[in-house]
């Protein structure tokens, strides 16, 4: 039995199995948060504190807070359109905290922070425009109607954002000089190649999707 109100359905006889799955998903979300905190704490050893807390661990917490905050209106509106841009906001916020935690940021840290920002902005805006043009992301058909499952997806994104940027954040926080760091230039070249490849691939896929003849097909070359 159910009562529909403003698009939501409240069951008068809750299913115990469904409640069990909901609890598991919520616990999984907190487990993912705990993983980020543990890695953040371990990576903070020997590094600076921010507001008396281990720097990298605090930054990880901010990333999850941003994801969980934007999850609330996303679930209420049953929309996935802000999922990817949430990652972009988290990337930029986390990098920003790392940058402003130091009074005198070395050029090395400045460049890495800039690379994070450029990459996150480019990808996030591209995905945001695409989902609004297409109207939906098919991955979220069933997920976005479930509070606990949608929360897990946002939590996984938060962990992914932190893990993929943890090394760069550590570099910024440690704030060492660029002088004599050959690995930095090797990494910069790899980043430039990867960024150019990603931009090219996204443009090829955009043109593929805009071609009506390819409707329902998957791009397999490029």
Task: Report each predicted region and the residues it spans.
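Membrane-anchoring alpha-helices and their flanking helix-loop junctions
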Residues: 2, 10-221
């Amino acid at each position: 039995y159910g009562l529909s109100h403003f698009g939501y359905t409240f069951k008068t006889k809750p299913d115990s199995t469904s409640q069990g799955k909901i609890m598991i998903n919520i616990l999984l979300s907190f487990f993912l948060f705990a993983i980020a905190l543990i890695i953040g704490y371990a990576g903070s050893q020997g590094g600076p504190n921010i507001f008396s807390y281990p720097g990298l661990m605090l930054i990880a917490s901010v990333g999850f807070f941003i994801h969980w905050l934007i999850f609330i209106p996303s679930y209420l509106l049953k929309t996935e359109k802000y999922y990817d841009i949430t990652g972009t906001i988290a990337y930029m916020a986390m990098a920003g905290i790392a940058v402003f935690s130091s009074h005198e940021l070395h050029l090395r840290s400045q460049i890495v922070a800039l690379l994070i920002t450029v990459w996150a902005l480019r990808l996030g805006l591209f995905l945001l425009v695409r989902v609004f043009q297409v109207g939906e992301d098919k991955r979220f058909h069933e997920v976005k109607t479930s509070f606990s499952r949608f929360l897990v997806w946002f939590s996984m994104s938060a962990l992914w954002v932190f893990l993929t940027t943890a090394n760069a954040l550590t570099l910024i926080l440690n704030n060492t000089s660029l002088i004599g760091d050959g690995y930095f230039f090797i990494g910069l070249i790899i980043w430039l190649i990867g960024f150019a490849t990603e931009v090219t691939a996204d443009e090829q896929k955009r043109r593929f999707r805009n071609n009506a003849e390819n409707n329902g097909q998957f791009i397999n070359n490029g």
